[in-house]
Amino acid sequence: MATPLPLVFSAPKRGMPPAHFADLSDEQRIEALSELGLPKFRLNQIARHYYGRLEADPMTMTDLPEAARAKVKDALFPTLMEPIRVVEADDENTQKTLWKLHDGTLLESVLMRYPDRATLCISSQAGCGMACPFCATGQGGLDRNLSVGEIVDQVRNAAATMQAEGGRLSNIVFMGMGEPLANYKRVVSAVRQITQPSPEGFGISQRSVTVSTVGLAPAIRKLADEDMSVTLAVSLHTPDDELRDELVPVNNRWSVAEVLDAARYYADKSGRRVSIEYALIRDVNDQGWRADMLGQKLHKALGSRVHVNLIPLNPTPGSKWDASPRERQDEFVRRVIAQGVPCTVRDTKGQEIAAACGQLAAEENSEEK
């Protein structure tokens, strides 16, 4: 049996990129412009280009003095990431991009187009330190936290793609690589930039942003106190501590009861329904009695402020884990609903391009070895 990986909460400091416009406060931006000999009002112009027009190259910002554009680019807009692989599925409605960062680490984002919306799944860390055994990213370990700029620029890239198609990016889910609440300050800063109206941000509604977590209970409570209305998604995966200690090792630190108590605090503070993510794994966590227990615990802890998303597992190559058969999925849904908790099977757009978190990066790394 493979030795379990240790939990890693503190990311290595190495490899962080040069400061980007999105990393800086307004005061820091004004100071940087002043050092370039540019007045304060240029900040508003640059912000409107970046957040409003989705431009990241000052050479195209024609209302800036021509002589200053290269200096602004060097000082505030370093190249953060380059696409090295793009894979499409679902009649090109799902697009997964593998990005190489300045230090060679990899991250992924997935753009999913639906008839009524466009959703971007973004990464908050390069790798992940939560060590969940059925997750490709968790088994790869944590390289480092992403900077605010690296998180925000995933959104700008996708928003620009949708704009070029005559559409609009409407939803953001922090469900890519990494544990968002383990990179807390940067994720919260990124959420504020994603949701503030132009020229301070991209103007996406907070209610259209989902932040996921494997259950860092103190950070869930801290997020509740930020007075934001983003959706909280808790990756629970089983209702009992005995199995969750194995599937989600952070459960050894914060139990199911502690996580659900923190989720209730978030629901009470935000007024938002909490989403419970549950990856159905054949013969591991898909038993009917676990569905009953899940529904009972969620109804007791969260009442009407909860919804269960069942996720058919995306098996990783060589893994012992496999997805539950459809009939067992349907039975699980029926039994959770019978406990008074809404439950649906999540659409698995992009399954054929390994759209589960970390799988494209894992494939790339194995090809390089």
Swiss-Prot record:
It is an enzyme of class 2 (transferase). GO terms for cellular component: cytoplasm. S-adenosyl-L-methionine binds at residues 178-179, 212, 235-237, 314. The active site is at 108 (proton acceptor), 357 (s-methylcysteine intermediate). InterPro entries: Aldolase_TIM, Methyltransferase_A, RNA_MTrfase_RlmN, rRNA_lsu_MTrfase_RlmN/Cfr, rSAM. The keyword Protein transport does not apply. Its cofactor is [4Fe-4S] cluster. It catalyses: adenosine(2503) in 23S rRNA + 2 reduced [2Fe-2S]-[ferredoxin] + 2 S-adenosyl-L-methionine = 2-methyladenosine(2503) in 23S rRNA + 5'-deoxyadenosine + L-methionine + 2 oxidized [2Fe-2S]-[ferredoxin] + S-adenosyl-L-homocysteine; adenosine(37) in tRNA + 2 reduced [2Fe-2S]-[ferredoxin] + 2 S-adenosyl-L-methionine = 2-methyladenosine(37) in tRNA + 5'-deoxyadenosine + L-methionine + 2 oxidized [2Fe-2S]-[ferredoxin] + S-adenosyl-L-homocysteine. GO terms for biological process: rRNA base methylation; tRNA methylation. Keywords: 4Fe-4S, Cytoplasm, Disulfide bond, Iron, Iron-sulfur, Metal-binding, Methyltransferase, rRNA processing, S-adenosyl-L-methionine, Transferase, tRNA processing. Disulfide bonds join 121-357. Binds 1 [4Fe-4S] cluster. The cluster is coordinated with 3 cysteines and an exchangeable S-adenosyl-L-methionine. It is found in: Cytoplasm. GO terms for molecular function: 4 iron, 4 sulfur cluster binding; metal ion binding; rRNA (adenine(2503)-C2-)-methyltransferase activity; rRNA binding; tRNA (adenine(37)-C2)-methyltransferase activity; tRNA binding. Its EC number is 2.1.1.192. [4Fe-4S] cluster binds at residues 128, 132, 135. Residues 114-352 form the Radical SAM core domain. The keyword rRNA processing applies. Belongs to the radical SAM superfamily. RlmN family. NCBIfam families: rRNA_mod_RlmN (TIGR00048). Reaction proceeds by a ping-pong mechanism involving intermediate methylation of a conserved cysteine residue. PANTHER family: 23S RRNA METHYLTRANSFERASE (PTHR30544), RADICAL SAM CORE DOMAIN-CONTAINING PROTEIN (PTHR30544:SF5). Specifically methylates position 2 of adenine 2503 in 23S rRNA and position 2 of adenine 37 in tRNAs. This is Probable dual-specificity RNA methyltransferase RlmN.
